[in-house]
Amino acid sequence: MATITTQLRSALLSPAASPSRRARRAPSSVRCDSSAASSLSASASLDADFDKKQFRHNLTRSDNYNRKGFGHKKETLELMSQEYTSDVIKTLKENGNQHTWGPVTVKLAEAYGFCWGVERAVQIAYEARKQFPDDRIWLTNEIIHNPTVNKRLEDMGVQNIPVDAGIKDFDVVEQGDVVVLPAFGAAVEEMYTLNEKKVQIVDTTCPWVSKVWNMVEKHKKGDYTSIIHGKYSHEETVATASFAGTYIIVKNIAEASYVCDYILGGQLDGSSSTKEEFLEKFKNAVSPGFDPDVDLVKVGIANQTTMLKGETEEIGKLVEKTMMRRFGVENVNDHFIAFNTICDATQERQDAMYQLVKEKVDLILVVGGWNSSNTSHLQEIGELSGIPSYWIDSEQRIGPGNKISYKLNHGELVEKENWLPEGPITIGVTSGASTPDKVVEDALQKVFEIKRQEVLQAA
């Protein structure tokens, strides 16, 4: 574990901000579990007054940093087009997102598949391989949550930094190596470690993600605790939390309600309990030394960009009303900062899914990586609609015969025989923001083949 020296800090960073309320308060007698903190700082331990914003500012202007590519955009986009585009999807788009192949009618969601942030990340990673054909290239995490794309990069010789017992082994990275930061971003501790190793950093972080980082840095500057709507183990949320000051991560409206009930002393719905139980519940989802009696007086909202839009908005409204009730409407601006960090691409795909479930379809096929948060929420919308919805990560989940292995929104793996009804069918189709069109086509081709065999057997 490296610790930033005073000399390095003075050379790179601006003077530390004035002491926060955390520095002024006495230490709490109850401490949160340190496991979350250790996962955030697996690569380096940073001093409390380390100016993360200034460090990031300086890093992005250094000679060993690139986030715009290397001048190979045209040829890498052509290669991606060859590998990931689909004639089936092209036909659907040319026919108003609906087309019939034999007994199968497919209705494609208006917004689906690769978002511009994902396409940008993959394209820059391809550029890095072309720019550094003979150098070792590492990824701090999967570039995106799609097994097809990740396997392609692996075949190109791009390696993931190894993980041992949940801790990344940065010792394998040497000076002169190339390290790609994925679309989800990377924790500031990881960036610091890589900068110290003098590697070439290729940053593919989605601009929407870095927008959330700016928001939590704003919270920190104003001495607000960041309430982050996300999954505490998700790469994006880990990175966002690393840029925050004091934070708590809530996965859903139920956890947000628990926090708000605690703020109101049990007067919301009575779901919360003692301070000790609060800290036990959120032991992996709070900043080190988090004290709910002190750190929930001034709060701001941020989110993992791939979470369900409606739930993020609901959480924001709930927290705002809670602070109004606790401190008075006239004082709410001193205790609450609203948010505007919902990703456009996530919102568009969710809105399109809400429209798709209103269509007359027999079932919905959701295609995307099983560790993809945004895809899980598309499946969630399908399940809530009552329409049979099947979330697969590749065409290999279909078959043999009329059988499918799919995941439910909450993660359960299910196998189902005869999932396709007999006779003519209409299928609604969508895909996650990390899913290439070719992966969707491959899945649909499996569906077409099952129905073709059905017709032949009936003849």
UniProtKB/Swiss-Prot annotation:
Cellular component annotations (GO), alphabetically ordered: chloroplast stroma
Reactions it catalyzes: isopentenyl diphosphate + 2 oxidized [2Fe-2S]-[ferredoxin] + H2O = (2E)-4-hydroxy-3-methylbut-2-enyl diphosphate + 2 reduced [2Fe-2S]-[ferredoxin] + 2 H(+); dimethylallyl diphosphate + 2 oxidized [2Fe-2S]-[ferredoxin] + H2O = (2E)-4-hydroxy-3-methylbut-2-enyl diphosphate + 2 reduced [2Fe-2S]-[ferredoxin] + 2 H(+)
Molecular function GO labels: 4 iron, 4 sulfur cluster binding; 4-hydroxy-3-methylbut-2-enyl diphosphate reductase activity; metal ion binding
Subcellular location: Plastid, Chloroplast stroma
Residue numbers annotated as active site: 236
Enzyme's top EC category: oxidoreductase
Keyword Lyase assigned: no
Pathway in which the depicted protein is active: Isoprenoid biosynthesis; dimethylallyl diphosphate biosynthesis; dimethylallyl diphosphate from (2E)-4-hydroxy-3-methylbutenyl diphosphate: step 1/1; Isoprenoid biosynthesis; isopentenyl diphosphate biosynthesis via DXP pathway; isopentenyl diphosphate from 1-deoxy-D-xylulose 5-phosphate: step 6/6
UniProt KW keywords: 4Fe-4S, Chloroplast, Iron, Iron-sulfur, Isoprene biosynthesis, Metal-binding, Oxidoreductase, Plastid, Transit peptide
Up-regulation conditions: Induced by jasmonate, copper, UV and chitin oligosaccharide elicitor.
CDD domains: lytB_ispH
GO BP: dimethylallyl diphosphate biosynthetic process; isopentenyl diphosphate biosynthetic process, methylerythritol 4-phosphate pathway
Binding site for [4Fe-4S] cluster: 115, 206, 343
Binding-site list for (2E)-4-hydroxy-3-methylbut-2-enyl diphosphate: 145, 234, 305, 372-374, 434
Entry's cofactor comment: Binds 1 [4Fe-4S] cluster per subunit.
UniProt-listed Pfam families: LYTB
Keyword check for Ion transport: no
EC number: 1.17.7.4
Transit peptide: 1-31
Cofactor(s) the record lists: [4Fe-4S] cluster
Gene3D superfamilies xref list: 3.40.50.11270, 4-hydroxy-3-methylbut-2-enyl diphosphate reductase, catalytic domain
Record note on quaternary structure: Homodimer.
NCBIfam families (UniProt xref): ispH_lytB, PRK13371.1
Family of this protein: Belongs to the IspH family.
The protein's role, per its UniProt record: Enzyme of the plastid non-mevalonate pathway for isoprenoid biosynthesis that converts 1-hydroxy-2-methyl-2-(E)-butenyl 4-diphosphate into isopentenyl diphosphate (IPP) and dimethylallyl diphosphate (DMAPP). Is essential for chloroplast development.
Official protein name in the record: 4-hydroxy-3-methylbut-2-enyl diphosphate reductase, chloroplastic
